[in-house]
């Protein structure tokens, strides 16, 4: 390849999982790259058809409708993802939980703008949350709930799984240089772009209006030891260099509502039943996009207090959080 005339990029995209998936590919054969990219996006759409909470025909919708009354068989791929979600729930101390759906509904975020529930409603929803309510039978490849009202929502892991599937399809097609993202919140790098060591990915900082000088519940709509220093200016997340690695960013300000002078975000702590309020942004980088998707949510929920423990779950993990008090916490 002539370094002065690098391989042209081929881009493909689709809308799935309520967001836009895009793939940028580099290589010598543009037609082959485009075909590989389209096949990778087909993988994303196939997974959406299995996991969607809002499609009555999906495997997860069927589980939610029937599993409290009888075991429901699912495909091996979906069962494997549910087992992975259970492991991540345990590793995160419950900060990541795919049974969060009753709380999401309670707070009005399931297809709505959000609403303030009363304490009794929160308590009822919390009683339905927890992986102890989900019985997985590997011999039958089935799922069962022990309570009526338990629901699964794979929104915090499904996008990462879709990107992993797309990346695997690209590699099987011989692609060695590509960048995949789903709504920019989860990104996966394959190899590196021409004439570069890796893919540069910037993390957008939280809006300055969300920062607070003091702590207050619900008030606000990396090979080195962890650093945690308060700053007096808006923290600026670093630009990360990705090569055969995935990055996920979780933040709570995308969907929120105001009530009584407070702003409540859509990311909920399954352990308390309340919206996350002290951490504005969390990012995780690992080779597996399924894990970065889930663990970035767990990190946002766990906050600064749980950052060190979560960062120690994987040797190669890089993490970053930004708190409402303008504190940037990085583990590289």
Regions found by a protein language model. Give the residues of each.
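Mature catalytic core of soluble alpha/beta enzymes
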Residues: 1-332
